[in-house]
Structure formats: structure tokens, C-alpha cells
Amino acid sequence: VTGKNTRARIKMRGKEEEIRLRVDTLFKVNSLDSDQTEVEMPTGKARFKIKRKLNRKKKQRRKFNVRTVTALIGVRGTEFVMGTSGASTSLLTLDGSVEMAAVAAPEIKVEVSIGEASKLDVGKAPTPPITVPPALQNSIVESDSSDTFGEVSFPPAQDLEEAVAEQKEKEEAQKEEEQEEEEQEEEEQEEEEE
């Protein structure tokens, strides 16, 4: 926990994972093992610099995940700034890409690339990523407060229930399409055999 006039820098795994906590931030490390790092940040603001290296034994990249009250953040070797107030989480990607999903529906997610921001409110899907002008990016990075994310004109977010229903419809339509393709291939094979 950082106080009103306190900041903290946390380095894990040497210089691979660095988190700079701003004032009034609640932060917790849930797990730190050879496969992944999981942290929790219910309130506050932080800047994350994550270099994903291969786990030598398993030949795969370590995972780094951040959980807030509303969002699940999947990090892919990147740098980003995130602010959360409990009911809302905003993030700006400075380098690489970050995946943001709703805690209540992890299948509903957006990928936020370099120079883009997204916001997730309780009961909503993440907003579509929006490009943030460099001056506003600097303001967000330099400020101790999450309030600077309020200067970003985020597009409207879809209701989470609506987004989940749409996702299910798309998946069902895709399954039907795949089944039709398989049936058509089988018919073509039967015709060739005759």
C-alpha cells in the first residue's frame, strides 16, 4: 500500500518485471512462480514494464496477469499504465500489447496495442481501444492520479450481458458453418468414390 505522498518501485525476477506504484495504491502479489506472475491492484495507479522471457525448462513464455475489481489484464511483454478505482479500470499501452477482459466474463476481451487505451466499468464490456494523442499519453504517464484517464474520450461500452450473448451467437454460427463444411466435404468425397 502506498500513502498520499508515497510511491514505490517493485522489481521482480531481476529486471524482467518492474512495477511503479503511484500514490494511494493498493497492490498485492498473489503468485510468483516459474510459469507466471499474478498480481492484484484493487485501487490506485501503476506503470508496468514487463519483459517476458522463456521459462528454460518448459520452453514457453512466463505469464504475467493483473487483476482489478473489474478487469483481468493479460500482459505480453509490454509497458503500460493502469488506473483503477474499484468500479472502473483504465489502461494505456506504451509498448507491446495488453489484453483486457471483464472479471465477470473473461471471454469478452479486447487487445490494446501501443498508443491505445481502453476502459472497463462494472457491468460493461471493455471499450473498443482508442488511439490516445502523445500529449495526453504523457499526461497520463506523469500524473499520480487515475483521474487523467478521464481526459480520454472513450467510446461507449456495450453491456456485458449483451456482449456475452453476442459472443455465444457468433460461436454457435461458427460451429454450424464448420459442420456444414464438414458435411459438404463428406458429400464431395462420396461423389468422388462413386
Where are these regions (language model features)?
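Flexible, surface-exposed loop/linker segments and immediately adjacent secondary-structure boundaries
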Residues: 1-178, 182-183, 188, 192-194
